[in-house]
């Protein structure tokens, strides 16, 4: 049966839709929450695409199960990848990045700084930073621009689909997951 499905812990669930292309699924509040699994059996990447409209909010659920937004994009298709040395399609990503020294109070401030230097904003342990590049080894990263870092246990990168353009990073070690 055609429709919009979600993979859940209890199996595949139909969210809505029908056999007709012009009939949109009835998704409560127009929101589908997507989480990532971590561990030895986790996938390296997940592709997300919106058929109608655009935009994704990035965040985590706090201890009260309230969504805390830490970033966003207007893109209609993104790939979320584990921040490791990984190849997704024709694109190769590395686990090492150059982190600039400044911290920022908001996603918007970090995004503005990232735009001026060719980097991307990162939510890093409760604050915002800017990182540049994605390198397969620490030696490949140009350390003169900042500090060479690698991501934590649950670090992920959000990439514009089918490109190597990193839009956002999330790195809270093993304390939080995007």
Kindly label every feature range from the protein language model.
Residues 1-178:
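Conserved, single-site charged/polar hotspot
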